[in-house]
Curated annotation (Swiss-Prot):
Transforms N(2)-succinylglutamate into succinate and glutamate. InterPro entries: AspA/AstE_fam, AstE_AspA_cat, Aste_AspA_hybrid_dom, SuccinylGlu_desuccinylase. The active site is at 215. This is Succinylglutamate desuccinylase. HAMAP family: Arg_catab_AstE. The lineage of its organism: Bacteria, Pseudomonadati, Pseudomonadota, Gammaproteobacteria, Pseudomonadales. CDD domains: M14_ASTE. It comes from Pseudomonas putida (strain GB-1).
Length: 335
């Protein structure tokens, strides 16, 4: 096993490798770019023209995706996986990963698209660094660009594995990419309708990548992810890396589509979310339900048919999103 193939071990021990570049038995070149960052370049004759960014550990306690990326990187490093795509592996928040905590000072996934410039602390600096890694990686013209930012959730979910598809004005969501997600085991996709401050939103909006946040189950410590089944995703990622995906896939069978109806923004310390603390993502809410209250008699009442809630979190900082109200989407606007 090449030393650079052990990116997780290097990250957990806060160790900088002496050898920054190594070549795999299949001729792929591994290059250490910085803490938690490794580029893989296929042999030039094998390059399929895809740049694939795989990120995990934006939240340090979300270990199943980190373990998945480590398995993929091991496969590349020992020659079992023969990459034809150019790859960038990123572990988002190394300090939080080492401590097994979601974040240390602030949520990195609320610091992209320039938001880090309005903040301070090492996590704001890390968000800027991650943006720069992605910007350089996706700077080569004439290549396809794909980014999967892998997460697990802090709560249970009625739909365990789902994706969030960022928004950019004038750009349609891709049916082909949705079919790829369905083949990777995603059960639902949330089609977003406004700009966001997450990592995948940055690469989608600013770098013209097809980009997704993938939610893959419940967050658990390292070595305790037996209940998080990522087999279909892992198989699909290997196919993407090796350029062996079936041609012409377009089926969205079994994939539920949702769109954002409203975001619930916490404006003050008086904010109160009228939901059980253990409510699951994608729980249905009936029309007329009083969802939340805040200062100045601000009230959120459910008005939509088929409404569901995801990411309810009344503990976020003032000014941030405390939940998303979503509704079923017909998919008629797909490109």
């Amino acid at each position: 096993m090449l030393a650079l193939g052990k990116l997780l071990e290097l990250t957990l021990t806060d160790h900088e490798p002496a050898e920054k570049t190594q070549v795999t038995p299949k001729g792929a070149r591994l290059r250490w770019l910085g803490e938690g960052a490794l580029e893989v370049r296929p042999a030039e004759s094998e390059d399929c023209g895809l740049d694939l960014l795989l990120s995990a550990g934006i939240h340090g306690n979300e270990t199943a995706p980190i373990e998945l990326l480590e398995r993929l990187l091991h496969g590349v490093a020992n020659g079992k996986i023969k990459p034809r795509a150019r790859l960038l592996f990123l572990f988002g928040n190394p300090v939080a990963i080492r401590k097994g905590e979601r974040f240390i000072e602030q949520d990195i996934n609320r610091l992209f698209n320039g938001r880090h410039e309005l903040s301070s602390g090492f996590e704001a600096l890390r968000a800027a660094e991650l943006e720069q890694f992605a910007r350089v990686f996706f700077s080569k013209p004439g290549r396809s660009r794909l980014h999967y930012d892998l997460h697990t959730a802090i709560r249970g979910s009625k739909i365990e594995q789902f994706a969030l598809y960022p928004y950019k004005e004038g750009r349609k969501h891709s049916r082909r990419e949705l079919a790829r997600l369905a083949a990777a085991g995603m059960e639902a996709v949330l089609l977003q309708s406004k700009s966001s401050i997450t990592f995948s939103a940055f690469t989608y909006e600013q770098l013209d990548a097809e980009a997704f946040t993938l939610e893959l189950g419940k967050a658990r410590p390292f070595g305790q992810n037996e209940q998080v089944n990522l087999d279909k995703l892992e198989e699909r990622l290997i196919r993407i890396i090796e350029a062996t995906e079936p041609e012409g896939e377009s089926s969205l069978d079994g994939l539920q589509l949702f769109s954002v109806s409203r975001e619930i923004i916490k404006h003050s310390d008086s904010f109160h979310l009228h939901l059980p603390a253990d409510i699951e993502n994608f729980s249905e809410l009936s029309k007329g339900y009083l969802l939340a209250e805040d200062l100045a008699e601000m009230r959120w009442v459910v008005e939509e048919e088929g409404a569901r809630i995801i990411f309810p979190n009344p503990k976020v900082r003032n000014g941030l999103r405390a939940g998303i109200l979503i509704v079923p989407d017909s998919g008629q606007r797909l490109g």
